Amino acid sequence: MVSTSRIDRALRALGNTLILAAAAFSIAACAPKGPSRPPCPAGQVCIQAGNVSEPVTLDPHKSTGTWEDRIIANLLIGLTDSDEKGEAVPGMAERWETSSDGLVWTFYLRDANWSDGVPVTADDFVYSLRRILLPETASEYASVLYLIKNAQAVNEGKAPKEALGVRAISPKVLEITLNHPAPYLPELAKHHTMSPVPKHLLDKVGEKWVQPGNYLSNGPYIVTDWKLGDYVRLVKNPRFYEADKVCVDQIYLYPTPDAAMAERRVARGELDMNADIQSNRIAFLRETMPGYVRTHTFLGVTYLAFNSNVPAFKDKRVRQALAMSIDRDFITEKLLRGGQKAAYTFVPPGVANYTAAPPPAWASWPLEKRQAEARRLLAQAGYGPKNPLRFEIKHRNTPDPMLFMPAIQADWKEIGVDARLVQNEAQIAYAAFRSRDFDVADAAWIADYNDAMSFLYLQQSATGPQNYGDYRNPAYDALLAKADAEVDAQVRAGYLAQAEALMLDDAPVAPIYFYVNKNLVSPKVTGFVDNIVDQHRARYWCVAKGTPGARNSVAPKG
């Protein structure tokens, strides 16, 4: 149970933040409307969507944010794609087969074209998989493809691109050879890291291919406009292989970093949806905007990463002390109140073919006992009233971190730690995390594919920039390597759980809570199906005509 005094202390710590948030909301209420809404052509269906942040790039091999993926996934389709439920279904590959040892995968491509009419071929995939792994591409996601034979060597410049385990057997047959069995490959194949890019266009214009006007798609939409700070406009691709099944003709995706303003824009009918909701507003919105709030269990975790290059965080006792002294129940139940669950493990519940490792023993202790143990560990490490531990926490300025980070700061003050909060826009924050320019980082991770490895690989030595804290443990790496080599799903899961348990004890990260996905969607939008990976391809959307109280997005004919 959370004591009243505990709540009072945390709310006092949150005071300034809440005052500022209230002021921001008040200003939003009186502010002028967002960017003007372009007209929808007669007879067409148009959707206006809030997309949280401004994309940095629409190059699938260089993007890192979910706000970019929400655009790219509607432009480019890999060997597989997501259905309405977020599950892997055939994409460019109509079917595939694997060798008996699980190492060689053969994909048979459908007849499909780029938006300029040029056929999509196996050579496009060979070119693309080589491109993302080339050192000069500097893809921060490259390590997710290290399961492909020689991928790591190519990415590190130790082998030529031709050594990569991919080849075009014919224009419509692609072969991928892996280092180890990977039953999750069809899930991974829908991720933007495995998206094809048009080789014939890059041969002609190079890196300018990604600009609107040059960009070629093989998916349901093409990008026609990108007005910085305003919107990205997607238009239905008439050459998409299932264009006749795509209902929405145009989509405008707006950066909506101000969640309060985005909420009001949805309420006013300026936006048909927004890809986030302030957690502590969910109950209110369910009452005031019935049918709009969409929440669902989500394969995602919010956590803190400790920079192992900072002297204080080289000491396991310091990391453990900080991890155990956070009151996660207060954060999820009193602050966020959006259905999030306190996290004491790193892999979320619901991941396929996996049972999470047992949480640390302290997870079941009362907060007061955890605080006492944390003070003892800090004292052993040389910190106390005469030598307090001091550091900065860099965090995102998105709605939820703005709520819970002051509470964590207050938790650590209770054990004698002086932590200073430094907030940044999400893109800037993550750039700092990837360059390891932080002491403690507030981060979040969403599964790229439904498998425990999508989470556990983050702390692997070879992972690179996404291993924010630069954690390195040979024993952890060895357990993941054993899991990679294992064909038996149950034995593999056991190795993964051992690795997770080892990592939790080492505490290079402190899990805070498991996500729920939160979308604000007009009831008139159909085909938007809540799912565990929060993937919503626009090819399945439509607009129900005559929805009560809804803005009419379907322009009249004539």
Question: Where are the regions a protein language model picked out?
Answer:
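Extracytoplasmic/peripheral linker and loop segments enriched in polar/acidic and small residues
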Residues: 31, 166-167, 332, 367, ...
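N-terminal lobe/hinge region of extracytoplasmic solute-binding protein
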Residues: 50-100, 130, 214-217
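Aromatic- and charge-enriched surface segment that lines or borders ligand/interaction sites
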Residues: 94-142, 175, 265, 312-314
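Periplasmic-binding protein-like
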Residues: 133, 185-188, 294, 309, ...
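Gly/Pro-rich hinge or "lid" segments in bacterial periplasmic/extracellular proteins
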Residues: 157-163, 167, 172, 180-246, ...
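Ligand-site clamp/hinge motif
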Residues: 209-212, 238-284, 409, 418-420
